[in-house]
Amino acid sequence: PSLDSVEFKFIADVDTAFVELQAGTIDILKYLTAAQAETLGDEDYNIVQGSMNLVHAMYLNSAYEPLSKTEVRQALCYAVDRDAINNFIFGGKSHIIGSHMIPAMSKYYEPEAETVYSYDPEKAKELLADAGYADGFDLEITVPSSYSQHVDSAQIIADELSQVGVNVTLNQVEWSTWLQDVYKGGNFQATVIGFDGTLAPSDWLKKYVTDDAKNFMHYSNTEYDDVFNTAYTTVDDDVKVENYKKAQMILAEDAAAVYIEDPANLVAVSKKFG
C-alpha cells in the first residue's frame, strides 16, 4: 500500500527514541540493543537484522605513556572479552573483528585478524608485568553518553580491565564535547566508538598513517605507513589487496586499538506495515 506521507524525527537520545517507539509515536527505529528488541516482543513489531558496517572498538591514545607501549596495548586486547560484549549488547549477532575493516569490504577484508587475540586475562597480566605495569595503571575511557551501545560496552570493558589491575574511570560526555575534545583535539586516553567508511579500503585504514589529519589516536608505525602507501598508490589490484590485508594484520598485531565487532543492526518495524 502507498503512504500519504513520511515523517522523519531526529531524536538525540537513543533511550528517548526507544520510549517513543514503545508509545507508538514512531514506527521504525534502528540500532536497537538485543535487550530492547527482546523487550518489544513480536506482537507489534518485526525485528529486522542487518549490520551497522562499523568498526566498533576501544580506540587508544598512543601518546598516553602506558599506551605508548605495544605490550600494554596487547594486554588490553587480551583482557577484553569481545564475545561477552557481543552477547550482552547485541545478542551474539554481531561479527567479531580484529582490525580496522568490516567483512562487507569483501576481498580487502583480512579474516585472520579476528583470531590474533583471544580472551586471556592471565596473558594480559603477564604482558603488563613485562611492560613494567605489574600493579596496573589508571585509564580514563571517554564515551559519548547519547549512544547506549558505546556506554554499555565501555562499562563491560571497565569491569574486565579491573580484573587485570587496570583502574578505569568512565567519562561520559555530550556528543559535541566528544567531537571537539576527542576526535578533533585528540585529548583523551581511550574511547569507545564506532567508525564507518566508504567502499574504498583506503578510507578505513588511512587514519592510522602517522601524519594523517584524522589520526586522532596519535598512532605511528613506519612499517604500517609503508604498507598502506604501497596499497594506496599501486595500480595493481593484487598488490593493493595484499597490502591492505597486510596493513590490517599490522594494526591487529601492534594492537593499535582494541577491536571488538561490526555490530548487528537490529531494526524495529511496526507490524502496521505488514
Language-model region placement:
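Detector for C-terminal structural segments
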Residues: 77-108, 149-158, 179-274
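Immediate post-signal peptide segment of exported/extracytoplasmic ligand-binding proteins
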Residues: 1-4, 70, 121-140
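Short, well-ordered beta-strand elements
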Residues: 3-9, 136-145, 168-171, 189
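Structural transition elements
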Residues: 96-130, 147-150
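Ligand-site clamp/hinge motif
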Residues: 1-38, 167
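A bilobed periplasmic-binding-protein/Venus flytrap-type ligand-binding module shared by bacterial periplasmic
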Residues: 52-75, 79, 88, 263-264
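Short helices/loops that flank or line small-molecule/ion binding pockets
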Residues: 15-25, 39-42, 71, 155-164, ...
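A ligand-binding cleft/hinge motif common to bilobed small-molecule-binding domains
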Residues: 32-43, 197-202
